[in-house]
Amino acid sequence: MVNKKIIVLSIFISLSISIFPQLRLANIFGDGMVLQRNDSINIWGWSKSGDKVSVFFQGDEYNTIANNDGKWLVQTKHYLAGGPFSLKIKTQKEEIYLKDIYVGDVWLCSGQSNMHMKMKSVKENYPEEFNLTENKNIRFIEVPSQLNFNKSEQDIKNSNWSSLNSKSIFKFSAAAYFFAKDLQPKLNIPIGLILSAVGGSPVESWICEKSALNYKSVAKRLNEAKQEGFLENLHKKDKENRQNWFLEAEEKLLNNDVFYQPKSFDHTYKYKWFPFHKHTGVYWFKKEFYLDENSLSDTRLYLGKIGDSDSTFLNGKYIGNTLNRYVDREYWFSPKLLKKGNNTIEIKVYNFRWRAGFMFGDIMEFKSNQTNFRLMDEWYFADLCEMPPLKAGENKFWRPVGLFNGMIAPLSKLKLKGVIWYQGEANAKKDLAFAYRDRFSSLIKDWRSLFEKKDLPFLFVQLPNYLKSN
């Protein structure tokens, strides 16, 4: 019986070796990618230790040997902008073939939610941008979120390149899209955009450990993050705090007999006054609208962002909720919920920390196949209960160094034209803003060192605030 198990295990191992490929490229490489023009190009990956790896590009052949860890890298000559080309990598037993490769300028696009915000979030403000034909000279890839506080990751998580078209535009970074839209026709070359950004992240998340250790408070937060179980315990505590806050709020609503709806609406609030600064707690918003007919389809409410969490109802029926103040609300619903004549939207809002209600500047709209109209005028609202602010939670992505190691360091061999950076709200507080000028300088030095380009261009937006300061 033991011998049979050994035989079966041996067969499984031999099959694994033959079935699963040893040769692979770093995940930044793929069909449709853009490589940097007028510079040597690094192409790298992994194979079986000792394998001869051959790379074929534009009629040229490059050869190398995989090292003891299986890593390999070839460096090509300089190439002019152009495409499409193919890229072939092979060993004696395996082959990888990539198609639709272009050579042009490659830009790394990083920061917090300013850079991460997708075109789908600005569609209501820029509808004309979505009526486009395919532009193969603008390409985009997003680096998936990944953290490491102890060492640099060797590779990013799997992702794919996309050329710009009417479908892919929705997932493009809005800031990066408008940057490329302006730049590409002026240069008349392919533009590659690599998005590596995380909402809410401070500058400290994107610097290397050596730089982090130069700042006492930053080094302390990094050392805490390295401790086993530390972040998990913080997350658990944050979750408990949030649950307790909700339970206390619900108890107050029940005691005041306003859990399901307010007794009356005593106030109106103009859209231009939002968000307002009364207090944290629970509010109820209400608006009526009139329909001449009810034979509609593709019905939805677009409400923009709401501070902080909402539950939304149409004619007394629940149609959706969102917990995050930074996410645009778009709620699709059955047209059967509508009626000819007066209809009512009601929104129950839980405000945890600051600035309750709608966000001035966001589009608010009723949409359907036949009729669209804006909802950006007066709303009734009721103040249901006051609550103490919920203590700010801990986000693991905001700890120092983790994003540098996880989402920048794995790209270190890539050749770039430059970096566009849009970040700052997370560092705009009084105790952080002054330190930002030094820490952002550290980031630029870190990245230039990482990519081995001492004059790597950095185009950046400085310390934008979130909403008005008052």
List the model feature ranges, each with a label:
Residues 22, 28-103, 353-358:
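Ser/Thr-rich low-complexity repeats and stalk/linker segments
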Residues 27-31, 279-292, 329-331, 405:
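Short beta-strands within extracellular/lumenal beta-sheet-rich domains
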Residues 44, 289-316, 345-347:
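Aromatic-lined ligand-binding clefts that engage carbohydrates, nucleic acids, or primary amines
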Residues 155-195, 200-202, 298, 308-309, ...:
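A conserved hydrophobic secondary-structure block that centers on an alpha-helix together
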